[in-house]
Design a protein with these regions (language model features):
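Bacterial N-terminal signal peptides that target proteins for export
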Residues: 18-32
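Structural recognition of the beta-strand scaffold that forms the well-ordered cores
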Residues: 61-65, 92-97, 102, 125-130, ...
Length: 349
């Protein structure tokens, strides 16, 4: 890691605007630019279909965001500032890895709908994954004690209405709900772009809702979705796999720890699939609210870091910034990561 540079890649004419959501849009916004601090992505050992875009771009950029907006200031100023800068950038799409409100505020329909409308102001396709503050934490007294399962269904009804992304341009998404045994799980998605498999999962922090009646079926669905993503990536000789979810799976905790137990089986599957795939694998998540890139997954036998696996955690409350990811087929690491600090959101230290 530790490469400084500029990136400038082409536009994406094959992703066309579609109608239907434009009435929700507030505005299109323009121009912003920042110096890029870039990090190489993952190490490399060697050099039912998912939805895919129309042409296999060899180089492109996309954005990763998460854990925003959390409060009124973020919702009315800081989050729109970030959307403004992303709208001015050349991006294939934007992925939000979960949590669009604080865990201490009520899980109302109005809170959901407000952010849904804001997502439609994205000029780029926007893909949203579910986080704990929007459903699994909604049973807390301080959130007005909503039923988590009912709130999860509300999220599905609002944010997964079609088999396309949100935003003013669209990306087609394959949903796990197309498989009869996983018909409930519309939020689990995948798509391919430029030789990379992207798979989004419903994995909420802090503990993946472990020990609840809904955990078992959802965990089984997530594991099957991960396995399918790797199987397709292998069959189609794709260059890399990126898994995206909200929860920090607590790589640093003992497997017996209360917070880790809900992730153990999933991490075992990710380890097995990563070792078999042998190409770059990236796990993106939010939850802990600070930007980092590291390689925390250890081999079960070697107890050494698995070289082709990288964890990326996105910015989050109170830091309302975004991460640019550059993809290049010709780079053996495939991904490079560039934190983008929103000029209007910078603090005076």
């Amino acid at each position: 890691m530790g490469l400084f540079g500029w990136t400038r890649f082409g536009d994406f004419p094959h992703i066309r605007p579609t109608s239907g959501m434009n009435s929700l849009s507030q505005r299109l916004i323009s121009m912003a630019a920042l110096v890029i601090l870039s990090f190489t992505g993952c190490g490399t050992l060697a050099g039912k279909q998912p939805a895919r875009t129309a042409s296999p771009d060899l180089r492109y950029d996309f954005a990763l965001i998460g854990d925003v907006p959390y409060d009124e200031l973020q919702a009315t100023h800081l989050f729109p500032n970030m959307i403004e800068e992303m709208n001015a950038a050349r991006l294939a799409f934007v992925v939000h890895d979960g949590d669009i409100k604080s865990g201490s505020t009520p899980c109302t329909d109005e809170a959901f709908e407000r952010v849904f409308v804001q997502f439609q102001t994205s000029r780029h396709p926007l893909i949203y994954l579910f986080g704990d503050n929007k459903w699994s934490d909604c049973g807390r007294v301080k959130t007005n004690a909503f039923d988590p399962s009912e709130r999860l269904q509300k999220l599905r009804d609002l944010f997964t209405q079609s088999d396309q992304s949100l935003g003013q341009r669209k990306v087609a998404l394959a949903r796990q709900s197309s498989e009869p045994r996983f018909a409930a799980f519309r939020e689990n998605i995948r798509w391919t772009h430029g030789g990379v498999m992207f798979a989004g999962l419903n994995v909420p922090g802090d503990d993946n809702h472990f020990g609840t009646p809904e955990f078992g079926p959802r965990n089984a669905a997530n594991i099957a979705w991960i396995q399918d993503a790797f199987a397709i990536a292998t069959k189609e000789n794709l260059r890399a796999v990126m898994l995206i979810m909200q929860a920090n799976p607590h790589f640093d905790l003992a497997v017996t720890n209360r917070l880790r137990r809900g992730f153990n089986e999933m991490l075992e599957v990710i380890e097995k699939e990563t070792l078999a795939f042998k190409k770059p694998v990236v796990l993106v998540h939010g939850d802990s609210h600070y930007f980092r890139i590291d390689q925390p997954l250890l081999g079960s036998r070697s107890r050494r870091r698995i070289e082709n696996f990288t964890r990326v955690e996105t910015f989050g409350n109170p830091d309302v910034h975004w991460l640019r990811v550059s993809v290049d087929w010709r780079d053996p690491n495939v991904f490079r990561f560039h934190p983008q600090y929103v000029r209007k959101n910078l603090l005076k230290h």
